[in-house]
Amino acid sequence: MLSGCTKEKQSVPEAAPSVKKEVVALSRVLATIADNEKQDAPPSHEYAESSVKPSSDMIIEINKYGNGVAYIAKIGERYCVVHNGKVGKLYDSIEGYTLILSPDGQRVAYGAKSGETSYVVVDGVEKGPFTDRGRIAFSPDSKHVGYDAKIGNNWYMYVDNIKNDGALQYFDRSVFSHDSSKVTYLEVTDVSGVYRLITSDLKFKQNMALTIADTAYAVNAEKTTVAAVEKKQTKWNVVSFDYDHPDKLKTGESYDDIKQLTFSEKGKSLAYIAVKEGKSYIVLDDKEELLPEGEYPWPFVVRPENRGVGIFIVHSKGKLTSAYLHHAFAPASQQNKTYKEGAHLTYSRDGKHHAYVAILNEKFTIVVDGKEGPFFDRVVYPHFSPDGKFLVYRARQDNRRFVVVADINGKIIKRLPPYERIFDTTFTEDGKSVAYGVKDGNQVAWKVEALQ
């Protein structure tokens, strides 16, 4: 047995019932990192997007409800995953981007290598050996896990311990349906780059195959609806279907090009950018509107209740860029202020208020309904409270990281305590407190703070 691989650690989070979707409303320690579990800075492409980039990085995943935590630790010259206090087996390497928690926080999976041999590790059990492997996904009920892996020259899609017939090229991006009874994944069958979108039962006995033109298919947040792009001769169109009736396809209008399939945060409203006769349009549920001239490289957002789309219009001149927020399918209004960049657009639940991150003179601010808040060295990911009366976001100033609570006008109500690292924010069920994970020294903790 390898030293340090099988012991049980302290500070184990309390067990959570299966798929508990209530945010933990009490502050508590989730994990205590042992002194011999070194932090090891990963390559820049593996920085966790869910957190502000810290001064020294450890790959950490925290359940969005506060019900579990996993991290990659370096012990000596090898690596292991610590999940809810249990230390896993040591490997030569563990790919940080593969580390994933189940929705209930009680299961963990990741990709690991010993020498040149790859494994998928699920709840401490090795799957393999493989010559390569892809990404991993848990089902919404946390009972199933899907991943793609290579044996010899063939790739296979797995759900739990069952694999499909395989393909010579690769599979990618398994997504489970809302009721965890079906799985959708991308299949490339030959070197010509023909993509097939497969929707199957979990035993790969019944499936529907759809030939598509792009790898970027989309699934809505509730995992009830799937959308992809078809190409017929020289024209492109969107096709979509519900998991409950995958055989009933809905086909959109034909365009010269289609990109950025985007669902609303809730529901089935679908938007995308389409090109027709050299002009760009934003299409929302089959309604189209001509976009202002410019570029549209950044993600856009569908407003709640199908009220329109918020999209940044970007203009480039050499190395200089400028951007402003455009509200499509909305009454004509004065153009929003131009900034160097705009990002992380969000709306209140009723769609009446919006906020986003803007950069001006190399400083960051949150713009709320067109009004600038205070400027910081960095701000990310604003979120409105459920009642739309408060806004919270993560900020960095003078190398200190903290959460800010602001009113609907962007005025700061309180600045919460600083920590070494802060993860994305959410709200307790009553909407009166903000909750988030932090790393501070050797502790990973769940913090809950009143909004006022």
Residue ranges and their predicted role:
Residues K9, P17-Q452:
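Non-catalytic tandem-repeat scaffold regions and their flanking low-complexity/translocation tails
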Residues L2-G4:
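C-terminal motif of bacterial Sec signal peptides marking the signal peptidase cleavage site
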